[in-house]
């Protein structure tokens, strides 16, 4: 079967385990999350010592993977063979070795859960992922589109029982981009410093994510839209004097992304929030910011 990362996570957490998992894609966050979930669920804690094996591609060729997969679990219902960075496994470029792996996947051992994690997109024209899909689960972890990020960040915070403001979401997304690992790491770090009832606000993000409260690219953006020349120049001078904390390429990307969308608004006849969100490819949360600058 072919599942999205979220669908697969749901099934794993419900302990609906399949004998084969083929995980690939250019979003390492989901690849790692899926691997961690399988490590937690497949083999009980008391049986992990003898029945859970984590291999790394550079140290495990196809023969090693198959030898482990064909073993029977030790006094247990099943074993987990998890191969991380499987793209580095020697033998995958050999037709003979690949056929051996395909033969196993065509008739997998019911007591073995074999998981191959590939960093990067696998060539789907090849037959190996198709065999895994037929008898197990195929999961592609795609990079998240920018317009999906705000909702995803908000949902992640809420999944941890936290409240987060729209402005805080915007600051995280625009400062970090679609690096899901870093976004989740920063939110986790923030929550360690807050009580359960405290909201993640823009001020909290400024404090704990290392963004200067008065002199950052977001304040520069705001000063420019308000045509506050004095403040804009002060911030620009500060950013230029601190290039390590404010790399010029990052500053330019954030400003370009914002003002290019403002320019699009000027050329759009239907300026309803719903239409602009679709045209700009952003969450409706942020349309007002662009409208106010237009």
Feature map (PLM): residue ranges:
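Conserved beta/loop motifs at nucleotide-recognition and modification sites
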Residues: 1-294
């Amino acid at each position: 079967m072919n599942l999205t990362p979220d669908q697969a996570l749901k099934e794993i957490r419900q302990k609906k385990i399949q004998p084969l998992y083929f995980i690939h894609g250019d979003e390492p966050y989901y690849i790692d999350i899926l691997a961690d979930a399988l490590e937690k669920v497949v083999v009980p804690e008391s049986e992990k010592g003898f029945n859970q094996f984590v291999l790394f591609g550079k140290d495990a060729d196809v023969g090693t993977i198959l030898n482990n997969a064909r073993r029977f679990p030790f006094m247990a219902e099943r074993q987990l063979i998890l191969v991380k960075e499987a793209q580095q496994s020697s033998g995958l470029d050999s037709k003979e070795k690949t056929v051996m792996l395909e033969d196993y996947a065509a008739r997998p051992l019911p007591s073995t859960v074999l998981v191959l994690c590939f960093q990067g997109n696998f060539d789907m024209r090849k037959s190996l992922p198709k065999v895994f899909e037929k008898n197990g689960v195929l999961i592609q972890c795609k990079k998240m589109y920018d317009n999906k990020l705000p909702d995803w960040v908000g949902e992640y915070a809420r999944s941890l029982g936290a409240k987060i403001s729209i402005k805080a979401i915007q600051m995280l997304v625009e400062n970090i981009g679609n690096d899901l690992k870093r976004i989740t790491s920063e939110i986790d770090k923030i929550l360690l410093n807050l009580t359960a009832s405290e909201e993640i606000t823009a001020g909290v993000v400024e404090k704990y994510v290392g963004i200067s409260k008065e002199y950052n690219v977001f304040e520069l953006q705001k000063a420019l839209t308000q045509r506050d020349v004095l403040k804009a120049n002060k911030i620009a001078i500060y950013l230029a004097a601190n290039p390590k904390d404010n790399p010029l390429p990052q500053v330019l990307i954030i400003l370009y992304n914002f003002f290019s969308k403002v320019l699009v608004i000027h050329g759009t006849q239907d300026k309803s929030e719903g239409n602009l969100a679709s045209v700009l490819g952003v969450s409706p949360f942020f349309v007002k910011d662009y409208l106010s600058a237009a």
